[in-house]
Amino acid sequence: MASARIADQGRTGRTGASGSGICPSCGARRMVDSAALLVDDILPRVPLRQWVLSAPFPLRFLFASHPQVMGKALGVVYRCIATHLIHKARLTHASAKTGAVTFIQRFGSALNLNVHFHMLFLDGVYRVSEDGEDDAPPVFRRVKAPSPEELQALVQTISQRLARFLVREGLLVQDAENSYLALESDDEDSPLPHLQQHSITYRIAVGPQQGRKVFTLQTIPPKHGEHPPLSPVGKEAGFSLHAGVTTAADQRDKLERICRYIARPAVSEKRLSLTHNGQVRYRLKTPYKDGTTHVIFEPLDFMARLAALVPKPRVNLTRFHGVFAPNSHHRVTITPARRGKGKPVDHDDQETTPEQQRQKMTWARRLKRVFNFDIEVCERCAGPVRVIACIDDPAVINAILTHLAKKEENERAATPTRAPPAITLIEQQLAQLTRKT
């Protein structure tokens, strides 16, 4: 909690927790910082395209429980898409380079465990010298958007290469009739795999209703028949590949909104509420085809859902590929920050580097950047506001919040002051008195 002062006035506001894996406030802070880092320091002013890959249920559990396998599988996916872009530009891997930034999302709209990849790819390639001795800067060459046929062929290639990768790793067993994953649990006594399996399949994990489907609310009519998607989607064996969102080179505001969207926290407080009988109600971001708009949890099962969404320790959910990788020789010449492997570009000593600007981005500046709301200026008198104290004692915070809640209740319960009589009513009364006299 932060206490601020405006000249002779005072203001108290709440700030977020620190370090929670699923805390909405901490997640929002990371969302803003990540988007600012990408737009200011990493992503160049060239067209970009978002590729989204979803995997079948068994692979979602594999990626959630074995992060090292997920990292290798993500490398397979990146190489498939990068090869597609390079070949479409009619170049080779030696003469062209591309890059991407991947956000690994672990959650779905219904708070279900759904590990999938949001990849911000260069919408083209950089042409480079094949021998690596030419000092000329890389030249960007854009490629056309993928057609529905290309998306379908690409998702089939990804599915086949991931299957071969899992067979080599000894994780996928194939026979004449079917194929299945052969997984070994790192900790057989841990309840986390049980919670993850139920979360992936939309089932209740704990309590007397264990194993049943989560209770849902259908508040709108279902959609009948097939409704074609707004943009092409490739589907194959449980995989889904979408690439319909793009940004032009000069659309930096749109790019930052996309970055904030794919880096958003798992839980949205605006969609979360309690029912009259104490159950947890969560509104879906997009209604299902059958008209489902909400999911209902018992409090204990809701906690189990949150536990399943927490990643393992020291698992990086943001990955950099190609020219954006830290060890890439081209990063120093392509990224706006001009930092990377090789000789760094000299900066003016009087200028502030992007890293220093990011370190100075306080929570007030984050609010102003995202919501265009300046917490350092009073909305009533336009006077300057400064933070005079940060409070972390739970007892003091609870006492202040209780006092503020009572103050708001008293203000709402106070009898509203009577408005002045309308001018027309006064004129009518004066006219009547005039006629009588």
Locate each region found by the language model.
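Beta->alpha loop/short-helix hinge microenvironment recognizer with preference
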Residues: 1-437
